[in-house]
Amino acid sequence: MEINFVNKSKKNDLDIKSIDGKTVISINVKNQSNYDIDQMIDGVERFLDKKINVNFTNIKGEDAENLLLKLNNISFSYTNPPKYNIPERYFPLLNEVEDYKKIVIEPNKYQDTMLKYFIKKIPKNYTYKKFSLKRNDKNFPLTAAVGAGSSHKSYFLHVFPKKHNKNWDDIFLIGKCVTFDSGGMNIKVRNMEEMKTDMAGSAIIMGVLNLTNKLPKNINLLIPIVENYIGSKATRPRPVLPSISVKTVEITDTDAEGRLCIADAVEYFNEHLYNKNLKNPLLIDIATLTGHTYYISCSTSSIVMGNKKAKRYMDKLYECGEQTKEFIDILQLRENYVKSLKSSVADIKNWSPQCKAGTLVGGAFIDFFVNKNIPWIHIDVAAVVYNNDKVKSYGINLLTKFLEKI
């Protein structure tokens, strides 16, 4: 089976032929919108085997990049004859996208498996620290509370350069890795079958690191690895727990678990990594955080918010989204959002019925823990990594281009 993208004026939009006993599908992209190309690919997917060859004719540069990223939920090999002129930098991106889709689409990848997978993918010029969490872990108390009901251990992984260069910018990427999210004691009543993808944020940043580890930047990955499950030891609603910095959190909803894990990662950064000698530090978290993003973006873009210090970075991220066709929508975080999370028994609660804007409230909760001296961006990708039974290869190209440009 072979699929060709062509760019010719005098050619049908879609041709399916049998040549020497092999099915050859040609998709003409001349004057076609991204939506039209998506529709054509969706229309022929039922003909495709698990392994196909992807070839290009008269398509160059970013057009080829953006087209190939539309081949979601299928596996492919690819060739690069000289006449096709596909940029060399793109082939590592293809590999990372393929790895991302495979790990996200497979269910029941438990914490041990994910930890080994991530460690195996760490570039040679990087190293790591791993933390095995106890049930009432004082170093990562909120993540430990999320994983209390699981029969599998929870972990925290910190990936960082073997040699820190003081002249390079310091970038910190947090990726949510909830291997499966049942909702905990506040059990999900719908769409639980999609929760195998709740570790997409961590898979995205690991792919990004493998594409950017040669850039003149000190890139750190912070990954809480946990399963939010039901069991006799699962965290009940409304306990009050201390965070790493001893800020107290009332857990009013065990299904708002992602923000708890990210808060641990943010405070790990605050307590152990932040210092005044960092050069242009930037903190970014990326997570499948809230289902409310479906109502905002119609599954076409991620939702982004951040603090005032990060405005120029968010503007640059928006530009990169337009270039890569991995779009973002930027929302404003206002003080009244975090006020809705005020607790009578703790410093903050992780969910409140007082504000129905769930995506904004999730961001506001994380913002409560962020060091105000640091530019911080929150990227909620819940609506764009999994839709209509397909894993979407969103985020890797976007963040790679962003880190190349800042």
Where do the model's predicted regions map?
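A generic structural signal for tightly packed, nonpolar segments enriched in small/aliphatic residues
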Residues: 8-14, 19-20, 101, 111-406
